[in-house]
Amino acid sequence: MDEIVLTYGLCGNSTLDLMSPNTRLVLPKFDDCISQLLYRDRIGRRSRSEIQKGHLYVTRGWTLDPEALIPQCQNILKIYGKDIGKEIISQIYGEYYKISMIDTGAYDVIGLEHYMKKVKKYLDVQIECVSGSTDILEKIISGNYDDNFIILNPGEILEEKMFRINEK
């Protein structure tokens, strides 16, 4: 059976009302990629409250983006100068007090740690490493969908309530 498989879930409501008229649509039942990367089969879902306010969650891939934090801060300082640039950076990142590196086991976290140490030049934050996994991504690749996935038949429209988890 043909199907369209997405690697992201609700993602800031960007997938709401999504519908495929002729093909089955499959996507992870997660409100954002952070929840998905923190999920581990052997532990299960973390409650939304475990995703801490004030934490900026990062992975190695995040640091490879040419518009990631360091290049962004450098660009702001270059355009606006030191004083105004620092104010702008504070407005963007001021509510974050901790950067949580998600160790999914898919890459060497040491390189990520080095990057985060450089981030401290721009932000006054603590840095920690938290355990995550690629369990959901592996299920996407294998097609081994479980109750962590939403499967829509052709013509079905994606609704926010489909992302709700039945608490046990």
How would you name each of these model-derived features?
Residues 2-3, 23, 97:
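Short coil/turn segments at beta-strand junctions that form active-site/ligand-binding loops
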Residues 88-168:
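Extended, basic/helix-rich recognition subdomains
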